């Protein structure tokens, strides 16, 4: 498509005026179509073809002849409107893009056909894994979003619940604790202790009064401030605390006086310990008297009748085996029917008796060995 505007030396509007001045007959003869074509050609809207043979028309006949020649010839002129030109341009662009996409798809298909089957399989697997990964990522994002929403909702509910409870529960707790001090004091009075020392009563009372439960009850009652009953209970507990403090101070003074001793004891505790020790001494003194009364003075160990019979049998056998002189030297004293009188200390007498028995046993063993050898 070539457009030459250099040959149009004169203004088309001035040329149209000259044509009107030459004769009105040409205008009356020309049809509306010819006038439209002339205006469109003069205005040079959109021209398709070459404009080499275009020249200034002399009359309407020359214009009609030139138009007829241009229509019959190869180099014909076509006037296109701007809208039509735009639609054709868009259509040509779409056709070109379609052709490029078709050629690219054909090229890809040909490349896939030319590739190795293992490569195609791997590519398909990669695409499948990519789809699975994208699905997993989207699911994970949804789960995280739901978790954040749930966390925010629970946190808001907890905050709302805590704020709601803080006002009602505090009031109910205050009213409940205001009723507990009397019960706590009754429980303290029911506890009964049996002390060993009189001073332990004070210690146990201080321990009971120092326990945290009654103090907490009294403190709760003080904070509650429910009336005269609470104030009376508080006074009662204050009096007991003051009494326990006084007893505790008195005991400390007594213990400080006995700080020189190894064990700190009060006077009452000392008296109690002395009484217990006296009882123990009396018991110890009574037990030896009972033991000595069972034995006669000057008499030590005496064999039982069964043992005495056994010793008599041994002596009779020895008398048969030994000569008379040897037998008289080794025979037992119990066989004579009387006991030798022992003089001196009881301990010496027992030692002598033991030595005599050991000597007799040795002699008996020697005699038995001799008999076995013979």
Curated annotation (Swiss-Prot):
The gene is fsip1. It holds the Pfam family FSIP1. Transmembrane segments: none annotated. Residues 262-290 form a coiled coil. Belongs to the FSIP1 family. It comes from the Eukaryota. InterPro entries: Fsip1. Keywords: Coiled coil. This is Fibrous sheath-interacting protein 1. The keyword Nuclease does not apply. Residues 12-28, 45-55, 65-77 have a biased composition (Basic and acidic residues). Residues 1-80, 95-120, 225-244 are annotated as: Disordered.
